[in-house]
Amino acid sequence: MATIALGIPTINQAELLQPLLERYSENWYGRHTYIIDNGNQKIDPVGSKQRIVKMSYNLGVAGSWNLLCRTIFGFGYSHIAILNDDIYWNKNADDIESYIEQNPADFYVGLGQWCCFVLPYETYEKVGMFDDKFVNAYFEDNDYEYRMKLLGLSVHKNEFFNPDEYKQSQSIRKDPSLNVNFESNKMRYIEKWGGFPREEKFTKPFEKIIAY
C-alpha cells in the first residue's frame, strides 16, 4: 500500500507559500508536510502535521530534496511528493496514493519541468541521493533522470502531476543571484556525463574516453 507525504523547499517565497499551506493542510490531512526554509522567512505551520525546518544556510535544491527524502522516508512513508514553492498542486493525498497503486512506476512527474514529482523510497534507495554539487539550482533534476535511465527505471509522465497554479521561477526573479551558478552547473553536467541533457555519452560519472 502506497503512503505519501509532502515536501517543499523554499528560500524567498513566503508570501506565496503561506496561503498554500492552508490549502495543503486540507488536501494532505493526516500526512506530514515538511518545509525546508533556506531563507529564514516568516512561515507558520498550519495544523499538527506541518513542520517548518529553518536552515542557517541555503542547502540548494538538491540538498533540500535530500533532506526532505531522509526525513519523510525516515517516518516510514513509501513515497514523497516534492513541490516548488511557487506552484499549487490541487490533489488529495488519498487520490495520489490510489493513482500510484493503479499505475506502478519508479518515478512520477508532470508533462513539464520537475516542479512537481513523486519519488518512491525504493527508487531513492537504488539511485541514491541527489547530487548537491550542482550548486543552488539547475541540472540536479537532469542528473537524477539520467541516472534513473542508466538503471533502466521507469518514469511515469502524466498531466495528473501538472500543477494547477504555476508562477515560473519566482524565486530567481526576486533574487537573480540564485541563478549565478547556472553556467558552472551546466559545465559540471557536461564533464560528468559527456554532453548536455539528452546528449549524454558517459555511462559512468566523469568517465574518460582514452584514445590509443
Question: Each PLM stretch: what is its role?
Answer:
Residues 55-72:
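Glycine-rich, basic loop-to-helix element that forms the pyrophosphate-binding segment
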Residues 115-128:
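Conserved nucleotide-sugar donor-binding
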